[in-house]
A protein has these predicted regions:
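Flexible, acidic/Gly-rich N-terminal and inter-domain linker regions that tether
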Residues: 1-105
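Short, small-residue-rich loop/turn micro-motifs
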Residues: 88, 113-115, 216-218
Length: 279
């Protein structure tokens, strides 16, 4: 992480405590600040009511609190779905979505700026790959939406911009933080992949409790290559074998995602092949 991308939320515990010590803050201020950020979801330093004004001023002048800034919101708070456009400290844009149903509120978060997978039906593919998000840029999407949501967030899905398994280290770090530090159950966190076979096997071996979703979208090698160029690297057969390996290793079910594309993958024969493929 470069100095330009640094924010307080991007600090680990040692770095945060060193910063506070350098400006003369008492040691207990660290826990107070953590509480404001991760339990009260404050937007800025000024909202931390039990911090002295001079400390707030020092922190405000020293470092930005959040690595992300909300630039645009689509949809009202009274609609079931809202889309948020964030700006990173490096000036790039990413999207998150807040979705509310009767008994659950889900956030869909991004893992990369752009995407290298090049799925023909995905708008992000036209951007190409720009950069990986660090773990705290991923986490900060949830923090912002926790503050904004009228309902408590219950589920998190890594289905926004980017291919999560091409940013594996930061995605797993963020997911573990959301689980251990922010209290989201591991089974309420879903990581979706277009089919990065080695990482499907890796996450099976590491035995994380997060849910896995695979974006399938076609039932033959030829059709999948047309709409998902990733198939040139990881064949459909390899993908299915890695999914079987994951299931036998973890005994956890996989969600298979299938976008219906008129005249491409939506025939009765496709449906029959899909049943046969996943049986």
């Amino acid at each position: 992480m470069t100095r330009e991308e640094k924010s307080y939320i991007g600090f680990n515990e040692v770095e945060a405590k060193e910063l506070l010590l350098s400006i003369g803050a008492e040691a207990f201020r660290y826990e107070q600040i953590q509480n404001w950020i991760f339990d009260n979801f404050v937007e800025n330093w000024e909202e931390m009511e039990n911090l002295p004004k001079d400390l707030i001023e020092l922190l405000s002048n020293k470092i930005q609190l959040h690595p992300l800034q909300i630039n645009l919101v689509s949809g009202s708070e009274y609609e079931p779905t809202q889309k948020f456009l964030f700006k990173t400290k490096s000036g790039h844009s990413i999207e998150s979505v807040l979705m509310h149903e009767k008994k659950r509120t889900t956030v869909c978060i991004s893992s990369q700026v752009g995407c290298a997978v090049d799925c023909k039906f995905c708008a992000t593919a036209s951007m190409g790959f720009i950069k990986n998000l660090n773990a705290y840029e991923i986490i900060d999407q949830v923090l912002h939406l926790e503050r904004i949501s009228k309902h408590k967030i219950t589920n998190i899905v890594f289905m926004g911009m980017g291919e999560p398994f091409l940013n594996y280290k930061n995605v797993i770090k963020a997911a573990k933080f959301l689980n251990h530090k922010m209290g989201f159950g591991a089974r309420r966190i879903t990581i979706s992949t277009a089919g990065i076979v080695p990482k499907i096997r890796k996450i099976a071996e590491e035995d994380h409790q997060f849910k896995l979703a695979i974006s399938l979208n076609a039932v033959t090698e030829i059709e999948r290559k047309k709409i998902m160029s990733l198939t040139n690297t990881h064949s459909l057969n390899e993908l299915i074998k890695s999914a079987q390996y994951y299931y036998h290793k973890t005994r956890r079910l996989i969600t298979f995602e299938y976008v219906l594309l008129k005249g491409i993958n939506d025939s009765p024969l496709d449906a029959k092949r899909l049943i046969s493929l996943l049986r």
